[in-house]
Each structure stands twice: as C-alpha cells, then as structure tokens.
C-alpha cells in the first residue's frame, strides 16, 4: 500500500470492527480510531448514558459530527465506526467519499454469541436481544452493502486473518 488511504470499518455490533481495526492499524503502521470511544471521550460519558439522557436521536447527532470530523480531518487512519453510523445518509456519504469502506459481515447467531454478556449495548437491553439483532440486520445490512468497497465475513476467523485478508484486497483495489 504505497499511499496511505483512510480505511473505514463498518458492520454490525459484534462483527469485530474494533478488534480487527486495531490489528489492521498495527500491521499497516497507521493510527486506529474508534468513533464510539471518541464520542464517549468528548461527552465525558458512556454511550449507555448518552442513550438514556439524549435518546438514540441525540446519540446519532453526536456520531454524525464525530464521523464528519474524523473522516474530513485525517489521512491514513483506520476508523472503526459504530454499528448504526450508516443510518445517517451524511455518514454514508462521508465514509464512501473519504476512504476505503470495509464491511465486516457476521451472522446474527455470531453477533448474539459475541454480545450476549455485554451490558454496554443499549439497543440490546431488552427481553429478546436476538429478535432486536434480526430487526437491526434487516434494516442495516443493505446500507452496509451500499457503501462497501470490500465485504468480508468475520465468523470463525481471527482478527489477524481478517486484517491480512483486508490488506490483500486493498492492494488489489489499487
């Protein structure tokens, strides 16, 4: 990869965006940024708290500002986005115009397995989280596909294997 372009990871919660993103950034000697972590840092509060106080709409406004800022003002970063970031047309436009978008795909079964004990997932704090995951997938998967330059299935693969595959596929894009 001669020129360092921005790499944006999109996909559902539990797809491995943060874990794979860190691995990928390390392998490419690039900076890794997690948009959810930046939102929490700037707000001085957890995403759970933001959802409780401002609702999902308030959180999405914060997310839109942060994604615009991070994608506009940086070059050569690996950015892990929140699972719902693609709900915003502005975010989809910014991501697809300012870097290579990698859709990390995973099954609802694998998502459920990876997220069932995680209490920091406000959308899953419900009686039937699997049903919520299925509804979210139905709504969001077409949006991930719409902006993806590359789609990779992450079930049953280590972060290192997926990151290596991403590097190979990006090299083939250029």
From Swiss-Prot:
Its cofactor is Mg(2+). GO terms for molecular function: ATP binding; magnesium ion binding; shikimate kinase activity. One of its GO terms (biological process) is aromatic amino acid family biosynthetic process. Its EC number is 2.7.1.71. Substrate binds at residues 36, 60, 83, 140. The keyword Nucleotide-binding applies. InterPro entries: P-loop_NTPase, Shikimate/glucono_kinase, Shikimate_kinase/TSH1, Shikimate_kinase_CS. It is found in: Cytoplasm. Its main location: cytoplasm. It comes from the Bacteria. ATP binds at residues 14-19, 121, 157. GO terms for cellular component: cytosol. The keyword Magnesium applies. Mg(2+) binds at residue 18. PROSITE patterns: SHIKIMATE_KINASE. Keywords: Amino-acid biosynthesis, Aromatic amino acid biosynthesis, ATP-binding, Cytoplasm, Kinase, Magnesium, Metal-binding, Nucleotide-binding, Transferase. Pathway: Metabolic intermediate biosynthesis; chorismate biosynthesis; chorismate from D-erythrose 4-phosphate and phosphoenolpyruvate: step 5/7. Binds 1 Mg(2+) ion per subunit. It catalyses: shikimate + ATP = 3-phosphoshikimate + ADP + H(+). Catalyzes the specific phosphorylation of the 3-hydroxyl group of shikimic acid using ATP as a cosubstrate. Monomer. Belongs to the shikimate kinase family. This is Shikimate kinase. It comes from Haemophilus ducreyi (strain 35000HP / ATCC 700724). The gene is aroK.
